[in-house]
Amino acid sequence: AYRRIWLSGGMAAAIALLLILWSPWNKSDSTAPDIKIFAALNVPEQVTTQEKNGRIIVSTPPTTIINLTLEDGTHVLLSANSRLEYPKEFTLQNKRIVNLTGEARFEVAKDSLRPFIVSTGDIQTQVLGTVFDVNAYPCNTPTVTLYRGRVQVAKTDSSHRKEISPGQSATLETNGDIVVSKATQTEKEGWTDNEFYFDNTKMMQVLQSLGTWYNISVICHSPNLLQKRIHFRFNRNVSVESLLDALNDLGIAHFQYKNEEIMVY
């Protein structure tokens, strides 16, 4: 069963916090190729639930977060544009396996005899009972962030695992290495509080987050902007136009919504 998280529209203006750390944006480099940061996905317009061969598949549309409770008592907060597949009943004697595309927070019910495994295709996260996030959108680098307990992270095709502690993130790099680093807790927790919260975050990651939340293609016309870092906090329950107006107030770049795409100059 799931419970929709309703986002309060009245909060948007009240909690906006914009910090400006840069001089006005650089002029667009007309010689550099455009970079497509995110391509809109084929996702449902509302929450969908399917049952097939004893497995349940839940998919979320843009700008929607839902709560799920699995058969073993595990609680899942499933983010927008995400898909979770799990068994109706955990019948295996030695493990509990779910499959995730997108982003979710798991609060895993303890079961010392059956580890809980989240598989994203690229990485597997194994736990006994804990609280953690998995971000595995197609456009993003797969990342696991731990809040409580212990988890082990491994590439899907590897037996070598890395264990992370609370306050750490494990990221699968393009070369196949799993890199462990200190997590920015507030930034990682922002989406569960219905906020965009970026703390010294690279523009590339910011644009990926906007694309995945609204399911809108994002194109950067000035690649040198992608390494800029941004401090930004804003409620998620606003139109894309309102959000881009707030980002434009930072003075770091020009954001425009045109032809169902976000353009960045």
Provide a role label for each language-model segment:
Residues 14:
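Hydrophobic beta-strand segment of the Class I
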Residues 4, 8-11, 19-265:
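A residue-level detector for the "anchor" residue at the start of short, highly conserved motifs
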